[in-house]
Amino acid sequence: MKKRNIKLFDPKIDFNEKRNIKLVFDSHNWASGSGSNFVNSFEKKFVKYTGARSGIAVNSGTAALHLAVSNISKVKGEVIVPSLSFVSTAHCVLYSGHKVIFSDVDPLTGCIDPVDIEKKISKKTKAIIPVHFGGLVCDLKKISNIAKSHNIPVIEDASHAAGATYHKKRIGSHSDFVCFSFHPVKNLAMPSGGFITINSKNSEYLTNTIKSKRWCGISNRIGTDYDVKELGWNYYMNEFSAAIGVAQLSKLNKLNKSRQNNARKYFKGLNLDSKMPYTNSCSYHFYWILVNNRNKIRNKLKNKGIETGTHYKPIHKTSYYSQKYKIPSTEMMSDKIITLPTHPNLSNLDLEYIIDEINKII
């Protein structure tokens, strides 16, 4: 019998992505905003999709976070982030000269805990960065209320949450800044890409400022003349990524619906108490379970042809960020978590197989 090979992540593509790539390739204009103008098109479509006031396409989720944090207080201070995240969530704070303050998560959701935010916040706090872990949306109402009471912005890390909703509004339309990541493993797949949506009252000013920073700080371009008024970076999205993104965005709701159906099957079928909750507002970038003897279980699943993950090693446990923090729920989750595939290429037989194998092992 042929051994199964079930991937943890796998983008779903069709002729639309191939057609768009060919259009860009044949145009010979592959840089942002040139040739077939897929970057401009993607920007407009994604802003409309999220319901945001404005938005800017960039070349990674890390770039999106960096640009967002670069526009908070120029007075150096502290930014509160969860440690249970990819390192970019913390890196972006240091890039802008601020100090990272790690907050714990709610062990029932994996999302940042508003109660712990209240404990960590101070007069030095300049922003809060909640992460929608696995696509499960944080308690934005509580976080927003905390931020407003301290007159600081919320910068959502929505790297896992393209297409997710909160109170029936899409993620991207709620906070001051919302940062997305697009990658072959993400819900909206691209070779590489990112996006910032902006919902502040001064969104027009911030959009223009970030667009300047996205291209090395260049502004006031007239013909071949331009000015540079502040530091910037080369964070443009390229036309190839945007071409794929336009095709992916047109079917994102359908792709996420498939992920939700897969997550529902895990939630109903797995004989575990500690598992990711089910809600139709989640985009389910992955599905997580918490187990003892994680490595042994992962190895058994690997031998059965099932790829799994461990999202994430806590940032405060890495050498660079090594700090004596007491973050018990984060450390418990990171020690026990196994992430399972939810991607739309999974068949019903694949899901049944994964569920059966896990139930046999546990």
Language-model-derived ranges and their functions:
Residues 66, 70, 74, 119, ...:
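Short, well-ordered alpha-helices that flank and scaffold nucleotide-derived cofactor binding pockets
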Residues 1-31, 341:
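N-terminal "arm"/small-domain region of PLP-dependent enzymes with the aminotransferase-like
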Residues 96, 149-150, 304:
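Helix C-cap/helix->beta junction micro-motif
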Residues 91-93, 146, 240:
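Hydrophobic/aromatic ligand-binding patch that stacks against planar heteroaromatic rings
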Residues 32-78, 84, 92-96, 102-104, ...:
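Phosphate-binding glycine-rich loop
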Residues 108-190, 195-203:
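Active-site phosphate-binding strand-loop segment of PLP-dependent enzymes
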Residues 11, 40-44, 49-55, 62, ...:
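PLP-dependent aminotransferase class I/II
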